[in-house]
Regions:
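Core catalytic region of metal-dependent phosphoesterases/phosphodiesterases
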Residues: 3-5, 10-116
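Conserved beta-sheet core of the metallophosphoesterase superfamily
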Residues: 107-110, 114-139
């Protein structure tokens, strides 16, 4: 079975609801730490997916500043992985390339799509997977 997710943003503290009520941060994820958030994301994915399933990650796994950490976190995911790169993933790849880890990162995936989208067939449906908005002017 195929599953789809986007904007995981492993390790992004700015996404957490600020415990101090600081209005400058507009995080919406209800975790006390990025470690708790990362663990819950992994737990939820693994509770839903099996090793026979494919998880399409439609952009934004992490940020450039925690690119190395994303490798160890992705290794905990059970399903096969396909990455359609989003805007933050380009920085992740660049940071990993600078450290000689790009190949290690990409080896965790069945496919890495560096373009803007991927067209797949899932059952009777054709799906255009893209991290970016798509407008269909024909309808």
């Amino acid at each position: 079975m195929n599953y789809y997710i986007s904007d995981i943003h492993f390790g992004n503290e700015a996404l957490l609801i600020p415990p101090d009520g600081n209005e400058a941060r507009k995080g919406t994820r209800p975790f006390s730490s990025v470690e708790e958030m990362n663990e819950k994301i992994i737990e939820n994915i693994n509770d839903c997916c099996t090793a026979e399933d494919t998880l399409y990650i439609i952009g934004d796994i992490a940020q450039f500043y925690n690119a190395e950490e994303s490798i160890s976190l992705l290794k905990h995911l059970v399903p096969k992985l396909v990455l359609i790169m989003g805007n933050h993933d380009k920085g992740v790849i660049a940071a990993l390339k600078a450290k000689g880890l790009e190949v290690t990162f990409k080896s965790l995936f069945e496919r890495v799509i560096s373009g803007d989208s991927l067209l797949i067939r899932d059952g009777k449906y054709d799906l255009l997977l893209s991290h970016y908005p798509v407008v269909n002017l024909a309808t």
